[in-house]
Regions:
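Short beta-strand segments at enzyme active-site cores
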Residues: 68-74, 132, 169-174, 202-207, ...
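Aromatic/hydrophobic pocket-lining residues that form the small-molecule binding cavity
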Residues: 54, 86, 116, 155, ...
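Catalytic cores of alpha/beta
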Residues: 118-120, 179-196
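Canonical Radical SAM [4Fe-4S] cluster-binding loop centered on the CxxxCxxC motif
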Residues: 10-53
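Conserved, mostly hydrophobic/aromatic
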Residues: 30, 38, 54, 73, ...
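Auxiliary Fe-S-binding modules of radical SAM enzymes
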Residues: 1-18, 195-299
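Conserved SAM/AdoMet-binding glycine-rich loop
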Residues: 62-168, 245
Length: 299
């Protein structure tokens, strides 16, 4: 009997915490595609998976994972899909996989902006929850320099819409993104921005620049200077000290971009995490951490 495989176009990315979710292709590539540091979808033109593609994959998923409880839609930002298309996706998922409880995906702040609070509430009822937002920073200068396409005010306004709709969300924080000498500003402003909101997870990555990015070209021209590994650690330390969540937030710094991985819950484990960071500063040399980053070939 021939093994049937679900079809995906190009590279597939998902957060570490979605490891147990069923992956389903909803979009291909990125609708924004202008962030200076990113080349994940460089050679992939953005498009929406057709209904036929989605149903073909769901038929296969039904064979091998009929009791799946969570689906993670792949693509850089499937939440860019219209309200109606997201409704259709959720309906199809329920038809083929009736035990699915919730649906996650990557999202841009601009994707949320397109939807009304009433539409978001209906999407929550259909199962959309714990969407992962590539905020990267809560500092306006950094967001602008990296062509993120939105401001701190946009982050706060749109995430409050999610909260009012009952949709939980996760953030990405990319340390080192502000460049050399700017880590303190980025840490303080990002902590202050995130403190206004209620993310479930903050997924911490450390900037890793690859040759096929605009940022790599700027480094070559001298218009962007990378933060040292120690400055990045200090940025993370300042963020943790300043961040004041009103709910339990899971801090995950355990991707390949983090030379010394750690995880913890804030505010409960703040002191333990800070002690771990101090231990990293005491026991690892800048050159060793830098050598590790140079060996990273992909994320």
């Amino acid at each position: 009997m021939e093994l049937k495989r679900m079809q995906f176009t190009g590279s597939v990315w998902r957060p570490p915490y979605e490891a147990n979710s069923l992956l389903l292709q909803a979009t291909i590539g990125c609708s924004h595609h202008r962030c200076k540091f990113c080349s994940l979808y460089k050679d992939t033109q953005f498009r929406v998976a057709s209904r036929e593609e989605v149903e073909r994959n769901l038929e296969i998923a039904q064979l091998y994972q009929p009791k799946a409880r969570r689906v993670f839609l792949t693509g850089a930002n499937p939440f860019v899909l219209s309200f109606e298309k997201l409704k259709i996706l959720a309906t199809l998922i329920k038809i083929y996989l009736p035990e699915v409880q919730n649906i996650g995906c990557f999202a841009r702040i601009s994707d949320i902006k397109q939807k009304t609070i009433e539409q978001l509430m209906e999407l929550r009822q259909l199962g959309y929850d714990r969407i992962s937002i590539g905020t990267e920073s809560g500092d306006n200068i950094t967001l602008s320099q990296m062509n993120k396409g939105y401001s701190v005010m946009d982050i706060v306004e749109q995430c409050r819409k999610l909260e009012n709709a009952g949709i939980e969300y996760n953030f990405t924080y990319l340390i080192g993104l502000a460049g050399k000498g700017q880590g303190e500003r980025n840490a303080i402003n990002t902590a202050d921005t995130f403190s206004l909101l209620h993310p479930y997870i903050i997924n911490v990555l450390s900037l890793t620049v690859f040759p096929d990015t605009v940022l790599y070209e700027e480094i070559g021209m001298g218009t962007f200077i990378e933060a040292s590994e120690y400055e990045r650690i200090e940025e993370m330390e300042m963020f943790i000290e300043r961040f004041q969540p009103s709910n339990c937030v899971h801090l995950l710094a355990n991707t390949v971009s983090n030379p010394i991985p750690f995880i913890g819950a804030l505010p409960k484990e703040r002191e333990r995490i800070l002690k771990e960071i101090q231990s990293i500063k005491n026991n690892f040399r800048e050159e060793d951490l830098r050598d590790y980053r140079k060996r990273i070939k992909s994320l």
